[in-house]
């Protein structure tokens, strides 16, 4: 097998990277007739598998689960997840041959082996679904010619797919049909129906390609979505302790602060996030953000370059063969940090205090969102896709940190995302530590003192914030998010 993306010529690569179009609401119907009455079998019952299945069942679809023989015999966590929620569970041999749509939601590292087995049992002219295109794009696995291959990629961890659905909303999703496997020209309608069934029509469904999804997804999760949040949590916490802040308060300010601050981003972009600051704080955050962008630009671009070239995938797959040795080392290292082990702060922190005492956190978010977006765009990825991967998914990741800190985030994201996040944060932490030497009173841990304002400076800062391309595309895309529900902070 070989990297599918690297086998294409330059023109084909560009066409695939640039494929991303928001589907108008008038073409999305909750009736979902295409998959009604069909046998849908989900392979794997982890975070994505369970939560997508719950949403699909609640949308009136017939869902069952295929698990390995040993998973059923040993009654492992996947078996518990499925059976405790009332789903029928069977072996590959027993239920895959009955399926009209087989959705493979096992971890990326298992895809090659799992898909080889699935193809032996799938009936002629059936459909194979993925929620991440890594195996197709980076591994280059070939699928039987009669099988239609589709993808629905929710832009968040599986837990948030369910939570947003229960709120009556949903999470954005990219849908795609593998151009090498659509023999009956039915892939698009089936993928669209699947996306509707998990609630994504409430937030936005984008018609994309396997390649655009993989390259943008890897970039987003490695940098701003997971890697930057991880590195910033650890460094900001240590900085607060250095400043003499109560450790448990510092822990809560960081742990819950990301969720509170990014909730404003979800509803009104970077503009609203900075509007939550005083004018003095906004100007300070703006200029801190400019410095951070300059510092982090080479690292963000390196990650994008390694994703495009396949270098990242090659190195990660080598670690797979090495029994995840590097992944496990990084995982243990993060779990043993002071931030992860600090005591819980039980007092309520007022919402505005997170903004007032987290000015640096606001600056970090602004810098990371804009950098991730800008570098995706210069690589050929469309603005719509770059927006979801650098901004909209951010509060959904922050929600996981708010629950059980970085442990929860790393638990619910994929192993691929976790590996990439550790890779980025390992390089980002020294840069952030050095940047802490530039902090002034009011940047982190306490409120900045109000100072005399220059009207012209404030006007120019506001104009710069509002005119950034991610703010322009964000206003357009948020018009489709008609049922967005605010999250209440505890």
UniProtKB/Swiss-Prot annotation:
Domain KARI N-terminal Rossmann: from-to ranges: 15-208
GO cellular component: cytosol
Residue positions binding NADP(+): 45-48, 68, 78, 108-110, 158
Record bears the keyword NADP: yes
Annotated positions binding Mg(2+) 2: 217, 389, 393
Cofactor or coenzyme needed: Mg(2+)
SUPFAM superfamilies associated with the record: 6-phosphogluconate dehydrogenase C-terminal domain-like, NAD(P)-binding Rossmann-fold domains
Xref: Gene3D superfamilies: N-(1-d-carboxylethyl)-l-norvaline Dehydrogenase, domain 2, NAD(P)-binding Rossmann-like Domain
Cofactor binding mode and count: Binds 2 magnesium ions per subunit.
Similarity annotation: Belongs to the ketol-acid reductoisomerase family.
Function text: Involved in the biosynthesis of branched-chain amino acids (BCAA). Catalyzes an alkyl-migration followed by a ketol-acid reduction of (S)-2-acetolactate (S2AL) to yield (R)-2,3-dihydroxy-isovalerate. In the isomerase reaction, S2AL is rearranged via a Mg-dependent methyl migration to produce 3-hydroxy-3-methyl-2-ketobutyrate (HMKB). In the reductase reaction, this 2-ketoacid undergoes a metal-dependent reduction by NADPH to yield (R)-2,3-dihydroxy-isovalerate.
Protein name as annotated: Ketol-acid reductoisomerase (NADP(+))
């Amino acid at each position: 097998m070989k990297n599918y993306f690297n086998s294409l010529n330059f023109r084909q690569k560009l066409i695939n990277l640039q494929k991303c179009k928001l589907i108008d609401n008038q073409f999305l119907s909750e009736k979902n007739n295409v998959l009604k009455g069909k046998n849908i079998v989900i392979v794997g019952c982890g975070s994505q598998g369970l939560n997508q299945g719950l949403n699909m069942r609640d949308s009136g679809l017939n869902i069952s689960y295929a698990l390995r023989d040993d998973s059923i015999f040993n009654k492992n966590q996947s078996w518990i997840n499925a059976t405790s929620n009332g789903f029928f569970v069977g072996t590959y041999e027993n239920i895959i041959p009955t399926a009209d749509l087989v959705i493979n939601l096992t971890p990326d590292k298992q895809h090659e082996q799992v898909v080889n087995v699935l193809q032996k049992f799938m009936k002629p002219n059936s459909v194979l679904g993925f929620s991440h295109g890594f195996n197709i794009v980076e591994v280059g696995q070939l699928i039987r010619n009669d099988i239609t291959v589709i993808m629905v990629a929710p832009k968040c961890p599986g837990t948030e797919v369910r939570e947003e659905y229960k709120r009556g909303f949903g999470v954005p999703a990219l849908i795609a049909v593998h151009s090498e496997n659509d023999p009956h020209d039915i892939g698009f309608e089936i993928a669209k129906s699947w996306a509707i069934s998990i609630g994504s029509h409430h937030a936005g469904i984008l018609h994309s390609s396997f390649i655009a999804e993989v390259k943008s997804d890897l970039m987003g999760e490695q940098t701003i979505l997971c890697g930057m949040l991880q590195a910033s949590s650890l460094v900001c916490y240590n900085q607060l302790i250095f400043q003499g802040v109560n450790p448990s308060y510092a822990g809560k300010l960081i742990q819950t602060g990301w969720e509170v601050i990014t909730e404003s981003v979800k509803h009104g972009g970077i503009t609203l996030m900075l509007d939550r600051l005083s004018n003095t704080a906004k100007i300070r955050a703006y200029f801190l953000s400019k410095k951070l962008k300059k510092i982090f630009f080479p690292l963000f671009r390196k990650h994008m370059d390694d994703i495009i070239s396949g270098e990242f995938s090659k190195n990660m797959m080598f670690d797979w063969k090495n029994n995840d040795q590097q992944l496990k080392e990084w995982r243990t290292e993060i779990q043993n940090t002071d931030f992860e082990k600090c005591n819980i702060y039980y007092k309520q922190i007022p919402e505005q205090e997170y903004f007032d005492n987290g000015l640096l956190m606001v600056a970090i978010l602004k810098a990371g969102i804009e950098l991730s977006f800008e570098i995706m765009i210069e690589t050929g990825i469309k603005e719509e896709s770059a927006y979801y991967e650098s901004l909209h998914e951010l509060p959904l990741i922050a929600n996981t940190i708010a629950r059980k800190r970085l442990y929860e985030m790393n638990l619910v994201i994929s192993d691929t995302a976790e590996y990439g996040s550790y890779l980025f944060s390992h390089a980002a932490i020294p840069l952030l530590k050095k940047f802490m030497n530039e902090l002034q009173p009011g940047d982190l841990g306490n409120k900045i003192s109000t100072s005399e304002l220059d009207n012209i400076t404030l006007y120019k800062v506001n104009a710069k914030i509002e005119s950034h391309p991610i703010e322009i595309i964000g206003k357009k895309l948020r018009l489709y998010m008609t049922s967005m529900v605010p999250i209440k902070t505890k």
